[in-house]
Amino acid sequence: ITIIEASRRLDAVASGGLGLSRSRIVKMIDKGEVLLNFREASSTATIVQFRDIISLRNGAKLVVDEVTTTSKGKYRINLRRSGSDQRKVQQQSSSDDEDDD
């Protein structure tokens, strides 16, 4: 998966790589459901780097394979999904929607 983001913030990269809204990722980070390099992510503003591993407690995982800069100064981030498929990510999103009610 290749995403283009204005920053390398954890919430932006996770959102782009997992196909979830940035606000959803922020809520998940606040609830302790997002891990960065196997440790609970403490801030949405954490900068993601090469070889970082972003994972959700449900098993979905992203590995940062490459970070380069575009000609316009944005970041081209190559991610690899592992440990889960998109259905688990969608299930997490659906269960979060129910929790918000």
Which stretches of residues belong to each language-model region?
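Strongly charged
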Residues: 1-15, 40-101
